[in-house]
Each structure stands twice: as structure tokens, then as C-alpha cells.
Amino acid sequence: MKVILLHALEKLGKKGQLITVKNGYARNYLIPLEKALLATSENIKIFEKKRLFEEQQEAKKIDYANSRIKAIKLIGAIIFFMKSSKKRKIFGSIGVKDISKQLISLGLLIKKNEIKLPNGLLHYLGSHTVLFTPYKNISTEFKVVILSK
């Protein structure tokens, strides 16, 4: 029996794939648990349209993420002025929240979960590298510079 997978299943295939399985497995397991759909010509057409729509949405999200990365690269570096000790340690720390507020004040729409600090909170003066990941595997690095007041 031919079915269209609605979810990725280990050892069977990926979502949207047309596969052939035994009749009992399809009728008693895959179809009742909504893991697959009977592969009629109508269902194949509907699923193909849905897949094309999802691909278009994915492409839009990727384009938007790339445009946001270009905007981050135009900025170059973000500068913070903080009080510090003689040992170059700042009073307080700079975290994701502070960086996102600074980027928002520069006119970029940034969520806190899109910014990653590889070494944790920033506690020392100097230049630090921060990772910006707007969508899945699309990311870039930018600099955060901390100077003494």
C-alpha cells in the first residue's frame, strides 16, 4: 500500500515522502495515528501544494534572515562605556539583554534568543565576539567593544 508520510519516521522516510508499506502496517498503525495518509491522486496533489507553500515560506524566512545579517554587518561593532577597576574588570556585566537593547536602539528588530555569547556574560574591557543567529543555521559574528568611562 502506498502512503504519504506526514511526519519523518526513522527507517521509513522523511515528511512528505511517498513510500510503500504492508497493508496492515498502514491501516493499523500509520493511518490511525496520523503518521501517514493514503496516497490517492487527490491527496498527492493536496500534499504537493502544501509542500510548495512551505518551501516558499522557508525561502522568505531565509531571505529575511540574510537581510538582517547584512544590517548587523553594516553596524560593525557595538560600543559600551562602563566603569571598571584597574584590573580591566567592569562593575556589573553585559549580557544578551543589554546587547539586544543596544541593537534595538540602533533600529534593528532583534530577539534575545537570537544572540549567543560564546563565553557567557562579558565582564572585562576589550573587544568580544558575539554570535547572531536569526534563523536555523544562518548566523554571523559581530563585535562588542567595552571601554572604560
UniProtKB/Swiss-Prot annotation:
InterPro entries per UniProt: Ribosomal_bL9 (IPR000244), Ribosomal_bL9/RNase_H1_N (IPR009027), Ribosomal_bL9_bac/chp (IPR020594), Ribosomal_bL9_C (IPR020069), Ribosomal_bL9_C_sf (IPR036791), Ribosomal_bL9_N (IPR020070), Ribosomal_bL9_N_sf (IPR036935)
Per its UniProt record, what Pfam families does this chain match? Ribosomal_L9_C, Ribosomal_L9_N
| Keyword field | Ribonucleoprotein, Ribosomal protein, RNA-binding, rRNA-binding
What is one GO biological process annotated to this record? Answer: translation
Entry's Gene3D superfamilies? Ribosomal protein L9, C-terminal domain (3.10.430.100), Ribosomal protein L9, N-terminal domain (3.40.5.10)
* GO cellular component entries: ribonucleoprotein complex; ribosome
Superkingdom, taxonomy of origin: Bacteria
Keyword RNA-binding present in the record's keywords: the answer is yes
Q: Name one GO molecular function term.
A: rRNA binding
User: What family does the entry list?
Assistant: Belongs to the bacterial ribosomal protein bL9 family.
Q: What does this protein do?
A: Binds to the 23S rRNA.
Q: Which HAMAP family match?
A: Ribosomal_bL9
Protein known as: Large ribosomal subunit protein bL9
Q: What's the source species' lineage?
A: Bacteria, Pseudomonadati, Pseudomonadota, Gammaproteobacteria, Enterobacterales
